[in-house]
């Protein structure tokens, strides 16, 4: 297998392909304090755009400079720090979120900021898990000018749903009848 550095060198020399980097850590990651600078340097030198994965909710959401992140406060969440046997598998950040009460409104809103390489939400995709719910759907508002309903099909351990056909500046996702489905983020 090729090493990480070999892949970076190939990318630098050929200007073709992608190297995806996941960096795990604590609230300094979640708040994007250090990571935004490292990510920006990698993107400047090797290409790429965007901020990467952002969970449904975050204690550091208000502190992020790379993306404006808001969400309804009624999400039920489980974290590997507090729960040893979650209702559904944790996501890549060690959390899982549920819209438990179908009578309530659950939503997330993301807006790209003006930092270099992070001015758009590139190919926004919802990550969600398996559930026994065939009635769930989301209403997606991309850049406030296009609104669409999209069904959730929670058949796999991890499912993806493309939220916009273009790179959007902002996106709001409203969840409907999604009560048994684990939601992870974008």
Language-model segments: which ranges?
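N-terminal secretory targeting modules
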Residues: 1-24, 28-185
């Amino acid at each position: 297998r090729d090493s990480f550095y070999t892949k970076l060198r190939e990318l630098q020399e050929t200007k073709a392909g992608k190297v995806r980097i996941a960096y795990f850590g604590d609230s300094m990651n979640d708040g994007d304090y250090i990571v935004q600078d490292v990510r920006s340097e990698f993107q400047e030198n090797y290409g790429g755009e965007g901020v990467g994965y952002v969970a449904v909710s975050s204690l550091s959401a208000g502190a992020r400079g790379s993306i404006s992140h808001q969400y309804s406060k009624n999400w039920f969440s489980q974290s590997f720090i507090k729960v040893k046997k979650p209702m559904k598998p944790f996501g890549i950040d060690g959390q899982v979120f549920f819209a438990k009460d179908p009578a309530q409104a659950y939503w997330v809103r993301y807006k790209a900021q003006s930092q270099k390489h992070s001015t758009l939400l590139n190919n926004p995709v919802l990550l969600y898990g398996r559930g026994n719910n065939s009635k769930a759907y989301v209403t997606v508002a991309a850049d406030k000018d296009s609104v669409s309903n999209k069904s959730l099909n929670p058949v796999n351990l991890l499912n993806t749903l493309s939220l916009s056909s273009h790179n959007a500046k902002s996106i709001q996702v409203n969840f409907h009848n999604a009560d048994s489905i684990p939601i992870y983020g974008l």
